[in-house]
Amino acid sequence: MYRRICILVLTLLAAQSVCFARTVNPGMRAPDRVSPGGFSPDSLNTATSERNQRLYDSIQSKTNRRAVPRMLYRMLFVKPVLDTTMNGRVLDESRLLEPYAGKTVGDITIERMMPFDSCGNWFERAGNKTHMLTRERVIRRDLLFKPGDKFDPQLVVRNKQLLRSRPYISDTEVIVVPDSLDSTRVNMVIRARDSWTISIDAGIHGEGRTMVGLSDANIFGTGNTLKIKTNFSRRDFSYGGNIVEYKIPNVLGTFYTADFSAGRDFYNSELNLGLRKEFIRPTDYEIGLTYSDIKSKRYMVDLDTSLLVKVRNLDVWGGKSHYIRSIKSSVFLTGRYSYARFSRRPPVTADYNPALHDHDAMLFGGGLYREKFYTANMVYGFGTREYLATGYKAELVSGYSWGEFNDEMYLGMSYQTGGFRGMGYICLLYTSP
């Protein structure tokens, strides 16, 4: 009995170390990999890799002796299918697609796959049976290209990163097939594997407040997120209210994101509305508007107690970027207006509770940025592809704030860069207010 408990504990601890990673690669062919800057990650430490492999082999051999530990092992562990860290390479997918650059995009076929392997364990097979596949039109509306467009390798890689960023897609593959009848055309196959999107959440807060929540990031296969949180007191199980959240990641194929949340949590309440679009292409625009009406308790240090604060916030912004081919960078300009109005708060003065002052602010920014995505799995290192951005962003920001008691001018600058170096992926950030 003691040995069984030890095996079970070892299994759970090892599973925690891999963060319950469980991703299946959709049968991607392994092309030649390009390593920018000769990057070789720390995972090339052979002794460490062999020691870890011996540990996992030992756990596997011990858990195979009994049915329950064997089921837990198969449920929590998976052998990586695609592991770029083991050979020290990072993949520049855009370079592999260069032979097709400039050709005309022909037919685009969408292939959808279940989140789990059909040959997996009982839990995975049951999950596939209860899962509703993402609708084809949802994936198609997330494409940055259409039939008749010129094939752009960088745009295709950027689109793969966009699809992978969706909570309802675990992995995606783009297969380019030259047209047999027209040498100037290429047909494309988009393979997308769904994610398991149903999750349960819970939280324990002070004063006996407890929250349980249920969410689905792909409700009815639409790609939309629905989350419902119920609050109650764990002291007497009295009802404390519900909070409902809903998010549409791509409204009618416009790449606008809309989100909404409303409800109450005992004495706290919220109403949030948002509609926004971000920079996606090198030449693009962004625009957004958010409004919130929130009542919540805030801790007052000088009073050593929490008091209710009610505030309304409005935030409006927009911007434009343009790609300059000669410097392989985009120049951008942005503007932003925001205000905060407090209808319930503790006493305030010019130097007392400044965070609770009513204020308006107007900011303008401009600068340059360059962005390119490489494919690797060094972040998690368990067979899941990541799209890591390299490049830089330099920005100058200026603006003015009209406060309840005083006005202020703002001037700041920032520079950030990230890329692959000899020791790994390095990211640097500099800001000056």
What kind of region is each of these model predictions?
Residues 8-16:
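Bacterial N-terminal signal peptides
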